[in-house]
Structures are given as structure tokens and as C-alpha cells.
Amino acid sequence: MSRIALYPGSFDPVTNGHLDVVRHAVELCDRLVVAIGIHPGKKPLFTTEERLVMVRRVFEPVAEAAGCAFDCTTYDNLTVTAAQQVGASLMIRGLRDGTDLDYEMQIAGMNETMAPGVHTVFLPASVGVRPITATLVRQIAAMGGDVSAFVPPDVAASLKSKFAG
């Protein structure tokens, strides 16, 4: 039986922090499914299709290099339901700090009650990516700042293009 892991997020945009999580996650599973959450109340910078392309372009080579099957999907329901729908027994969550841990522990507890077969795996962020958030990256890019230290090169180019003119 293969071990399937779901890594959910908005990925708006993909950051080096997300990439750090994926590099570790592919070592824990046979198949990694990155799930992009679609939230009706949120207005993302990148369209769903743009985020799907970004996620595939950045994460798929990492999974392939590790011998891990890779998939990308979207979901607009409960994250734990999305995990069940793809057959995941693991849900991957990255942690930057104690605030993340407190929040994620609450969510993990609720998810465990709703889906006892889906186990949350917390991956601590590597030191170099701990301060990175997609929100800060968007703000820096919107103000014309250089985000190349925080996102993969393709993503930096996409952000520059998004805010040009």
C-alpha cells in the first residue's frame, strides 16, 4: 500500500518556504498531492490556473528527483475532506514558529476527530525560510521590491509581470 500525503495551501504565490516543505515531504510518502484551496471569500493575486501551473513547475521536479509520484489539485471543501478524497493518510503542514504550531495543533485536533485515518505531520521550516510568508511576498512585490530571495525564479518573474504597468 502506498503512502499518500496531502499538502494543502493557497500557494498565492509559491514561496521558498513552500518549496522547503515539499523537499521534506517527498521523503515521507510515495505520492504527494498538493491541494490548492479555493476560498470564495478570498481574492487571490494569481488565478487558480496560474497557481496550478506554478505549483507543478516548482514542485514536480523535486518530487520526481526523490522518486515520489506527484499530483496537483484544487479543493473548495474542508481540507480534511480533500485529504480523504485523494486517499491521503498524511496531511503535511509546515511550521515557521510557535504561533503556527498553536494554530495548526487546533486544526489537527479537529481534523483527527472528523477523519481519524488522516494524520497531520508537522515539518519545521528550515532556518533560512522561517520569515517568509506569501502575504509579505505579495506586499513587497506590489511595492516594486525584489522578492528573488523569497521565491523560486519563475515565481519572481510571474510576480514582476503581475505588477508591471
Curated annotation (Swiss-Prot):
Entry EC number(s): 2.7.7.3
Gene3D superfamilies given in the database record: HUPs
Chain sites annotated for binding ATP: 10-11, 18, 94-96, 104, 129-135
Site annotation Transition state stabilizer: residues: 18
Transmembrane segments: none
SUPFAM superfamilies xrefs: Nucleotidylyl transferase
Keyword Nucleotide-binding annotated: yes
GO molecular function, one term: ATP binding
The protein's annotated pathway: Cofactor biosynthesis; coenzyme A biosynthesis; CoA from (R)-pantothenate: step 4/5
Binding-site residues for substrate, renumbered to this chain: 10, 42, 79, 93
Keywords: ATP-binding, Coenzyme A biosynthesis, Cytoplasm, Magnesium, Nucleotide-binding, Nucleotidyltransferase, Transferase
Catalytic activity: (R)-4'-phosphopantetheine + ATP + H(+) = 3'-dephospho-CoA + diphosphate
EC class (word): transferase
HAMAP family xrefs: PPAT_bact
Its biological purpose: Reversibly transfers an adenylyl group from ATP to 4'-phosphopantetheine, yielding dephospho-CoA (dPCoA) and pyrophosphate.
Subunit: Homohexamer.
Family to which the UniProt record says this protein belongs: Belongs to the bacterial CoaD family.
Name of the protein: Phosphopantetheine adenylyltransferase
Naturally occurring in which organism (per UniProt): Rhodopseudomonas palustris (strain HaA2)
